[in-house]
Amino acid sequence: MNGHSDEESVRNGSGESSQSGDDCGSASGSGSGSSSGSSSDGSSSQSGSSDSDSGSDSGSQSESESDTSRENKVQAKPPKVDGAEFWKSSPSILAVQRSAMLRKQPQQAQQQRPASSNSGSEEDSSSSEDSDDSSSGAKRKKHNDEDWQMSGSGSPSQSGSDSESEEERDKSSCDGTESDYEPKNKVRSRKPQNRSKSKNGKKILGQKKRQIDSSEDEDDEDYDNDKRSSRRQATVNVSYKEDEEMKTDSDDLLEVCGEDVPQPEDEEFETIERVMDCRVGRKGATGATTTIYAVEADGDPNAGFERNKEPGDIQYLIKWKGWSHIHNTWETEETLKQQNVRGMKKLDNYKKKDQETKRWLKNASPEDVEYYNCQQELTDDLHKQYQIVERIIAHSNQKSAAGLPDYYCKWQGLPYSECSWEDGALISKKFQTCIDEYFSRNQSKTTPFKDCKVLKQRPRFVALKKQPSYIGGHEGLELRDYQLNGLNWLAHSWCKGNSCILADEMGLGKTIQTISFLNYLFHEHQLYGPFLLVVPLSTLTSWQREIQTWASQMNAVVYLGDINSRNMIRTHEWMHPQTKRLKFNILLTTYEILLKDKAFLGGLNWAFIGVDEAHRLKNDDSLLYKTLIDFKSNHRLLITGTPLQNSLKELWSLLHFIMPEKFSSWEDFEEEHGKGREYGYASLHKELEPFLLRRVKKDVEKSLPAKVEQILRMEMSALQKQYYKWILTRNYKALSKGSKGSTSGFLNIMMELKKCCNHCYLIKPPDNNEFYNKQEALQHLIRSSGKLILLDKLLIRLRERGNRVLIFSQMVRMLDILAEYLKYRQFPFQRLDGSIKGELRKQALDHFNAEGSEDFCFLLSTRAGGLGINLASADTVVIFDSDWNPQNDLQAQARAHRIGQKKQVNIYRLVTKGSVEEDILERAKKKMVLDHLVIQRMDTTGKTVLHTGSAPSSSTPFNKEELSAILKFGAEELFKEPEGEEQEPQEMDIDEILKRAETHENEPGPLSVGDELLSQFKVANFSNMDEDDIELEPERNSKNWEEIIPEEQRRRLEEEERQKELEEIYMLPRMRNCAKQISFNGSEGRRSRSRRYSGSDSDSISERKRPKKRGRPRTIPRENIKGFSDAEIRRFIKSYKKFGGPLERLDAIARDAELVDKSETDLRRLGELVHNGCVKALKDSSSGTERAGGRLGKVKGPTFRISGVQVNAKLVIAHEDELIPLHKSIPSDPEERKQYTIPCHTKAAHFDIDWGKEDDSNLLIGIYEYGYGSWEMIKMDPDLSLTHKILPDDPDKKPQAKQLQTRADYLIKLLSRDLAKREAQRLCGAGGSKRRKTRAKKSKAMKSIKVKEEIKSDSSPLPSEKSDEDDDKLNDSKPESKDRSKKSVVSDAPVHITASGEPVPIAEESEELDQKTFSICKERMRPVKAALKQLDRPEKGLSEREQLEHTRQCLIKIGDHITECLKEYSNPEQIKQWRKNLWIFVSKFTEFDARKLHKLYKHAIKKRQESQQNSDQNSNVATTHVIRNPDMERLKENTNHDDSSRDSYSSDRHLSQYHDHHKDRHQGDSYKKSDSRKRPYSSFSNGKDHREWDHYRQDSRYYSDREKHRKLDDHRSREHRPSLEGGLKDRCHSDHRSHSDHRMHSDHRSSSEHTHHKSSRDYRYLSDWQLDHRAASSGPRSPLDQRSPYGSRSPFEHSAEHRSTPEHTWSSRKT
């Protein structure tokens, strides 16, 4: 396409970079050019007739009309208006103007292209389109940042392809001023309809433009699906925002330059991204006048509308795809249809959902409606934030008519990937402060620099007597005294060069002290950063807010979000492009992002690293710890409320992190402080003083009101008692094992009982239709729990008093029940648990804390974040169920009892009397008191027990004996009540309950810290407790479960179980089959399972009776995987499969699986568990698999369970094996790795970018470092230099993930071959004697690798096929390559010495064709196009042999055609050259290179000739019933030996003869290895047969290889092949007794061969059904089975063969 357009000159005035030619429009802020730039087919056909003289002249016109009146209008009226003034007067027009440019660009591109091509040929235009695509698409990828960067590709005019005449025509026809706009005639409802001429000055908003971000990719995808016409198909990249704008309205002021351009037939339209809201509004109050900025300027067209008095329309608030929320408009269904917008399905879905909601609201109770309305209000508030600019991150280089650049805006509550370009005039009117801050940041002199002198030498400390003016921000906030002291302590530590731990108790303002300290460094010592703050996601917004409040002069960037967001930050927020100095002072990020981008973030020298919630670093073996400790930093600060949790080792880990030189050895630290509690901690306290500061509230906040805790004990309801007894009875067997039982079993029972103590619904939820009305439902809800009966009374009393309540529970399902209860009672509440994320969480907290808030309750999960959640506006805390870990409950209380609290805080802990809950509380009290008292002397707070060993499991502080005793607690009393006569708890007045409650007030006293730690425990007198008292009493008087649970209840349970078993025995056959199948697929048999459970070696009868366990995969008991949840195990296994040698790559796996808190020991334990479990599962299932033979259908393969996670053993091991070559090839040392280059020659990758050997090497390094499939991570690593090469923004450009996967598979195969080749050379070098030994040992080795072979044969085709391929490649090509190398060394041609050391002629090595040659080859090979396409696409459902035959036939057809083509040449050099060229062309259709294909073809020809000769021979020999076969004859010569020598004809012996005959093909043949146990008769197969299979085996492997990209198990398992082949060969080699039969077959074959020109050995390629038929109809010695197309052997050989073969192998030959 040619020609500069007036569109471009217009853009120059509006802040767009001028571009033309191929890149027309692609750099616009909206990105429209690129999309349209790629459409050519449609436009060339549309405009073909009439654009020959006019198309290029009016190329810039977006929607050209053919009426001349419009042109006259343009020439008559070109007035100019000051853009800024005009906009101020008519802001509502903005939405119209924003699209003017967008809609011009696509048309311009379409009209210019036909002018340049003029071919009208669809093929030509599409090929020119391809080249356009590549350049314009490339520009489009960068349009996010190039519009504003001076160095961006948007600024230079890319006019290389433009013809001068076109340029001049453009210049002469248009003067390119901003006012060149003209009204169009078609009105869109989104635009105001009566302002046509006044808008001339305003082209501007093209840039407000679409968001240029990841949403464009979505546009493209949606668009791809649409493809409504040929033009659309070409225009894959169009984004909808432009699409709709193609339609021109009378309100769009565009100038038509020159003559008319024909109107396109197919227009492109806007797309609905989301329907945000719905209303009934005034008729006509829709379109552009309803945007937020138009409403602010002109007023709301819907204002004052009353539904009763005037008719209205149902209107929908539309978020347009590619536009920010500020441009949302109200539309009716009618106006949307008029505009022909896309995405109407979204509107239909919204309407359906809205109708459902309305129906529900009609029948819902008032409190449900209230709850719904509150939720809606929160959502609306959130949506409003999307219209507020948080910060501006870029501006365009050129200014618009209004004299303002466009701005790139980040919106509040949305990630960076949702940034969008907006019009300068609009943003300056609404968000001028953001613009000022942006320019202030850009011009700031206070950016980090490396030569700051205080980094090299710390200054002398000068104490701050009063708060400096720079701290406190604009609002003049004041630090409290202790916070100023804390700031001084932090400053003192920094000056002394001590990194430190700020361990103030929760609620004392650690965040503010940290920010003030950074502010101090910034102002006092001119240290401007960079400061890195690593914080949990939950507190990130509060950190951001506090930085803005307390240190607004510092530029803090939040480094968060998906890869697009982070790339955006790196592009715009990271550094100044000119000076390369960092822009930010503080970088805020989370642990997870830090680990994802550790290579990038770890490359900076940080002046300061601060870690919030630093107890996450307590494990010095975790990946997070190892990653962060390696970061380069000048000073470190850890911020934690709980520096000491479980052991002294954890405290040492924190100290080692901040001061690795001082606290270098744990052993020394333990020796010094770990022993002797009397004096050890005093010395420790002294040593810690310079590094650790901890204050508690009572020490510093005298004003903090009292905290009173009461333990309220209540009885269970009757239903709870029933359920409680039922749980114990049901688990009688597990309980009666006592200390022999499993911890996990006891814990599970205990969790069930704890659920029962909370509420019956947690055990058995009610049916939906169980209750008739709300009142009944509420009563049942309350009566189902003793705790809720009490809570109900308590809340009613608190509501009367005006208290506000926080209710904590560990169980989210319990929170659901409480929420339901609160709705029934119509108590307004908020809720926060782990599932409520980010912005919604913030909204809920703010809503509860707001002045005059109506909220009465706040439901919280006890563990909802560590979290700095401040709910000081509440004065009552109800702990519904106590946590195992008292510190969690303590944190819960601190949500309310913290700075800012004015009232006394009452804490009510609910405990069920006579249940496990009560006993847990008592035991925890006894067990933990002493240790907490010790901790208090150190003035540090810990969670549980202080001891020097490693931490006990935080989830279960009790051992089996204690758990057993806890479970018995209260059970006896409970069973004394007869079943069905359980008493309801007696009614009691709430005041009476509170009076009786165990109460504890936290008055300050000498033991206040201990009391604080044990605030949940009422301990009468600490001093009376000697250590002896703490010892837990043994279960002296405890009864057995037989005595506790009545016998009749036990009998009834057993009877129920028996009935269940009988039911299962008679269950439907279909269900039985299903169970069997599960058992076959994954689980071990009943026998091994019963052994495991019962401990006996034989089948236990009771186990055999239990069909219900039949299909359960084996489970590794939970004790083995302590510390990992099921979700974590799943993540671990997913990552485990991405790495070769996974047990050596645990750090990478932990990073990928986000398990960085786990220690290497735990990870190794889990890794070994996975690996050993897989191997064992495969071993156990091998017999079953063999029996199944080549079963059709998908075989899932053996599975086993780790905890609750099912693992497919076959798949895991397959992935492990597949990636071993990569693991072995890439150096583990990072420095060596940087130098790595792939040692093999690689075929060119046909990507849309330059891709060479270096990129292949970097891709492999990336896979090694980040795991197979982690393409995003690989893209982000700057060291790999693939950032701009892989995963381009344009989804139509390669390489995307699919291409990368294919390339990676290919490269790993090359590595595998290379390794195999080297190994073979090493073995060759070892000499012949060793080789003989190897062969002798082979049979032994086979046993050891049985499991591995099983894996390979069964698993995803990749690994096994790869090994086959490696060996084949070796076996096939090694002898020839030796010969070839000898020749090539002699020849004069230049050679290239490869990594394997073999010279390859340079001419041969390069297998690329230039474009011209490629085109010639393409034409010449057109007659065999079908064969080329089918070469790697056999029909589905073919057996492997049929596939193989299919390939051979294709190859013969192609080769014959090439031979025909070469006949026109007489010059031998030409023939040689063109033969090579044509075969290189053929190689593009398959994985094999040209040489290999040619070789295979030659071999096929040879076979064809032999087959013809043999068929002649066969017809002659048939009369004598003998087929001559040199190999057979040779074999017969040896039959004169005695039996022993006959028997010694093992596989190896025969093969050695064969090797002599056909060069040495023995080394590394894994294929033969795997056959060894499946094909006992293969050793006697005749030599030709061997050769035959080997020559073509690669092809079938290749097909399987291709299949792996579709479905791993689509074809039958690979075992099937050897067994078929073995079976066939057996038949071929049996002796011939039935001569007539034999003759019949050979006659048949000879006739068919002449007909089909097939090799005599094609007999091998029988279809599956024939083989099945023959196998079924004949025994091993039946006449039919003994026919052979080749020679025969004597009966002696036959019997010898049978003697050497175990009889059972016949079963494995079944197909």
Curated annotation (Swiss-Prot):
Transmembrane segments: none annotated. Keywords: ATP-binding, Chromatin regulator, Cytoplasm, DNA-binding, Hydrolase, Nucleotide-binding, Nucleus, Phosphoprotein, Repeat, Transcription, Transcription regulation. Its main location: nucleus. The modification Phosphothreonine is found at T235, T248. Pfam families: CDH1_2_SANT_HL1, CHD1-like_C, Chromo, Helicase_C, HTH_CHD1_Hrp3, SNF2-rel_dom. Sequence repeats lie at residues 1629-1633, 1635-1639, 1641-1645. Its EC number is 3.6.4.-. Residues 121-133, 214-224 have a biased composition (Acidic residues). Component of the SAGA complex. Specifically interacts with methylated H3K4me2 and H3K4me3. Interacts with the FACT complex, the PAF complex and the U2 snRNP. Interacts directly with PAF1, SFA3A1, SFA3A2, SFA3A3, SNF2 and SSRP1. Interacts with BCLAF1, NCoR, SRP20 and SAFB. This is Chromodomain-helicase-DNA-binding protein 1.
